[in-house]
UniProtKB/Swiss-Prot annotation:
Acetyl-CoA carboxylase is a heterohexamer composed of biotin carboxyl carrier protein (AccB), biotin carboxylase (AccC) and two subunits each of ACCase subunit alpha (AccA) and ACCase subunit beta (AccD). InterPro entries: AcCoA_carboxyl_beta, Acetyl_CoA_COase_Trfase_b_su, ClpP/crotonase-like_dom_sf, COA_CT_N, Znf-ACC. Component of the acetyl coenzyme A carboxylase (ACC) complex. Biotin carboxylase (BC) catalyzes the carboxylation of biotin on its carrier protein (BCCP) and then the CO(2) group is transferred by the transcarboxylase to acetyl-CoA to form malonyl-CoA. Residues 37-307 form the CoA carboxyltransferase N-terminal domain. Binds 1 zinc ion per subunit. PROSITE patterns: COA_CT_NTER. GO terms for cellular component: acetyl-CoA carboxylase complex. A zinc finger (C4-type) spans 41-63. The keyword Manganese does not apply. Keywords: ATP-binding, Cytoplasm, Fatty acid biosynthesis, Fatty acid metabolism, Lipid biosynthesis, Lipid metabolism, Metal-binding, Nucleotide-binding, Transferase, Zinc, Zinc-finger. This is Acetyl-coenzyme A carboxylase carboxyl transferase subunit beta.
């Protein structure tokens, strides 16, 4: 729905009687009508009706820009209705180092927990996708930039071990700035712990699909995010270890290549397997999961590329 269409529809539904109101009252009423109803795309500046954007899973209908979505929204988009069974909901971070930066770590945790209604930066559990049982983990960037502390690492590890034990495929969505500095070495050790659990999952012959979303950096990239048997990414996702500004300042050799660290750049250079738009992700994941279930292979539709690769960028 365009802006002009919305105003035309609004005029049909109701008429605002502003006669006799002061200019301040008129401004307040117009602002109350407009606030939250429209979102401006940071990529193309197009205004999109918020409900239309939500129905399109936060993907700009004008240019395809992928806005960030929350972990609960991701689960709602992907899993069969009513199939989600959360795991390890009781796990919550502590402050063993009594860390203090601009404010105490414990106070910072409480603030993010209240703001996001999450205990930490990942949701893990079991569900089904097009009837196929799956173990799934989804990171939420709203919680301290999706940073990986001891709870995130523990939940990812337990999820992986559960998938290995129950012979389930594993799908993890990454969105993170890296390891959580407030937990020091306890955070860094999660890289080795999650990687070891995934190695056991692989040795058991089970599938792991890693989906990279914007942004995925640091210790998450250096551990489980890049260990998938299949590595997918959303269009435009920024993925790396250190950020481009840090790299430029460190190497001191001018500008980095255009598009460096984007999903498109990684695909062109063989670091990921496919770029899948969010609106097609459920269908594509279902196809990939079914390919690893022999009884379902015969009924699969043809698997076609979902994202064109520009040969000039290779």
């Amino acid at each position: 729905m365009s802006l002009l269409d919305w105003f035309a529809e609004r005029r049909k539904q109701t008429s605002l009687n502003l006669t006799g109101s002061s200019p301040f009252d008129k401004e307040r009423q117009v602002r109350e009508i407009a606030d939250g109803l429209w979102q401006k795309c940071p990529a193309c500046d197009a205004l999109t009706y918020t409900k239309d954007l939500q129905q399109n899973w936060q993907v700009c209908p004008s240019c395809g820009y992928h806005h960030r979505i929350t972990a609960p929204q991701r689960l709602q988009q992907l899993l069969d209705p009513g199939s989600w069974q959360p795991l390890d909901e009781h796990l919550a971070p502590t402050d063993p180092l009594h860390f203090f930066d601009q404010k105490p770590y414990a106070e910072r945790l409480a603030s993010y927990q209240e703001r996001t209604q999450l205990k930490d930066a990942v949701l893990t559990g079991l569900g089904s996708l097009e009837g196929i049982p799956v173990a799934m983990g989804v990171m939420d960037f709203r919680f301290m930039g999706g940073s990986m502390g001891s709870v995130v690492g523990e939940k990812i590890t337990r999820l992986t071990e559960r998938a290995t034990r129950d012979h389930l495929p594993l799908v993890i969505f990454s969105a993170s700035g890296g390891a959580r500095m407030q937990e020091g070495i306890l955070s860094l050790m999660q890289m080795a712990k999650t990687a070891a659990a995934l190695q056991r999952h692989r040795e058991a012959g089970q599938l792991f699909i890693s989906v990279l979303t914007h942004p995925t950096y640091g210790g998450v990239t250096a551990s489980f995010a890049m260990l998938g048997d299949l590595i997918l990414a959303e269009p435009g996702a920024q993925v790396g270890f250190a950020g481009p500004n840090v790299i430029e300042q460190t190497i001191g050799k001018g500008k980095l290549p255009e598009g460096f660290q984007t999903a498109e750049y990684l695909l062109a250079h063989g670091l990921i397997d496919a770029i899948v738009p969010r609106t097609e992700l459920r269908r594509r994941l279902a196809q990939l999961l079914a390919m690893h279930r022999p009884r379902l292979r015969m009924s699969l539709p043809a698997l076609e590329p979902t994202y064109a690769l520009d040969p000039a960028r290779i």
